Amino acid sequence: MLLHIPTILSRTHATSMQERLAAANWTDGRETVGPQGAQVKHNLQLPETSPLRQELGQEILDALARSPLYFAATLPLRTLPPRFNRYQENHQYGFHVDGAVMSLPVAPDHTPASLRSDISCTLFLNDPDEYEGGELIIADTYGEHEVKLPAGDLIIYPSTSLHRVAPVTRGMRIASFFWVQSLVRQATHRHQLLELDTAIQSLTASNTDHNTILRLTNVYHNLLREWSET
């Protein structure tokens, strides 16, 4: 399921992040991937240890927590703290697949933890007219889908998808990216639950008979109970 979620960040908030990132110390993005990824990755990335990455990442997590659509679509169990990248002229990232299992930051009790990447997320931090190229291109069984969204908007898609970032030919593309392990492993099941949840919300808003809504809500929670992993 490829889903555009608008206005995770307000325009003012996205602009504020751009301004703070402008003064950041960026590193070569190839330092964060293995030999295969390094052959096709040409961008800059904010270091994992950067206090700014942690500060802005927490702001994004707080914003996501305020989005009912994001929660309904992802049903998050674990989220990798948001990271940040920058594409300047001639930067690009060729087709690649995200790692299936990722390490989470070590907990205070030093217990190691990991995340299964079910959902890949890109949050755009500047507007499309500020750069040329730089489209996120996601390949699935229906072909290739180009994504280039306004500042503050989020795209989510299955982490099983091959994807790339097209070459930037003018300006600069700035974004945050992160991964989610969902309560529901299968993308088709998540899609069905989102469709059902959306229908329930629509019926509730139209003052449909309460018993009808209750029965559908019961179906939703029973499906979630059957499909969820905690």
From Swiss-Prot:
SUPFAM superfamilies: Clavaminate synthase-like (SSF51197). It is an enzyme of class 1 (oxidoreductase). One of its GO terms (molecular function) is L-ascorbic acid binding. Transmembrane segments: none annotated. Binds 1 Fe(2+) ion per subunit. GO terms for biological process: DNA damage response; intracellular iron ion homeostasis. PROSITE patterns: FE2OG_OXY. Its cofactor is Fe(2+); L-ascorbate. It comes from the Bacteria. Its EC number is 1.14.11.-. Fe cation binds at residues 96, 98, 163. HAMAP family: Hydroxyl_YbiX. This is PKHD-type hydroxylase PD_1553. It comes from Xylella fastidiosa (strain Temecula1 / ATCC 700964).
